[in-house]
Amino acid sequence: MSDQIEHGLLATVLRDAAAGRFPPANGEVTVLPAPSPRDSGVIGFTAHAVVFTDADPAWVRARLPDDDPSRPLSPAFLQALGTHTHREAHIIDMLCVAPPRSGQPGIVLRPEPDIAHPRIARAMRYRDDVRAWRTDGGLVLIGRGVASRWEVAIEVDPGCRGHGLGRALASAARHLVPDEEPVWAQIAPANAASVRAFLAAGFQPAGAEALLTHSELGV
């Protein structure tokens, strides 16, 4: 188990990763406190995993053998952690990040005021400070998610898919984040079209992530 960032914060780990400074690829696991009551889960980097949870670190370590670096993102461990913390593990997402861009987005956007929109309503369960914009055929939103990082989600209307709009929306998010901060994307690996769109928009793979949600917290 790693003690190099044991007493650090998840926000610091993410900020360093966005700048290309990843945890050491040594096959170890770092256990950090959950950054908020909402946020709990596992992030897997290259040969290094970060578990952020309110569970006792000793409990976590006892269930992660040193000779299995893939164990933290295994269904068995995620289920055990979820049961222990009264949370539910969901899908394992591909985690990508991109630096911000100056100037205006390359597509015309207008604020989307309808917070009842399903994509926006869902985002507000998992993120703070959610902001959304619409263009013809699509929607892009940003919000502060895990450890207050800026996260992006996009939606392309079915009739407008296959024409590069997803890439344009993902690229627009890089212009929309304030304070010149990086923007993160959680992408279902099976959604190949979304993966291609974000990669084409300049997002780079950083790792994989599984979040554990708590029904009592509304997430």
How does the language model describe each region?
Residues R125-V140:
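Conserved beta-hairpin
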Residues A49-F52, S148, V177-P189, E209:
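Conserved GNAT acetyl-CoA-binding A-motif
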Residues A185-V195, L199, Q204, L211-L217:
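Conserved beta-strand-loop-alpha-helix junction that forms the acyl-donor binding cleft
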Residues M94-S102, L211-V219:
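C-terminal "cap" of GNAT-fold acetyltransferases
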Residues E112-P113, A147, A210-L212:
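Catalytic phosphate/metal-binding cores of nucleic-acid and nucleotide-processing enzymes, i.e., regions
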Residues G137-W150, I154-D157:
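A conserved beta-strand-loop-helix scaffold within acyl/acetyltransferase catalytic domains
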Residues V152, V156, G162-L176, S194-A200:
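Conserved acetyl-CoA-binding loop-helix of GNAT-fold acetyltransferases
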Residues M1-H90, G106, R110-R127:
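N-terminal charged segments
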